[in-house]
Amino acid sequence: MSDVKDILIEHPIDIPEMNVKGFIDVVAIMESGEIFIYDIKTMGSWSWRFKFGRGKGNPSIHQELQLGTYGYAIREEFGRCDGLSLICYNKDTSDMHEVGVDLDFIDQSYNFWTRVQDLQKNGMPMLQDGECPVMDWECKYCNYKELCDARG
């Protein structure tokens, strides 16, 4: 592994064609030119056991799609993205675990956001649970929450 040239923290992204803005936790730019993205996820012991324990729960791809979206933005900005990783931190024990995410999620996230944009062309669509937003708690951050609440 080559040496780190630069580290970007809370790096802003803006993808107008996807109507997506956000911040990447960590972007590591290596002397070799390689670029790696890290998204830090904090979780309690129950979530940690669910994700890493013996009886691992069903995987959810929303975190992978989020990283893929970040990868798309970095690839557009810098011309490349060489690695995606979740850094999971157990806030109860301070344990950490790195989970690599396949670079195919860059294209999957692009396809996901393209589909959302296509659905939105005729106004705000009635999206199914698990599409967009993927998780119910994400609604509180959405600019259109009141419209969804009003439609039932």
Can you annotate each of these PLM segments?
Residues 18-19, 62-66:
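Short, glycine/acidic-rich beta->alpha junctions
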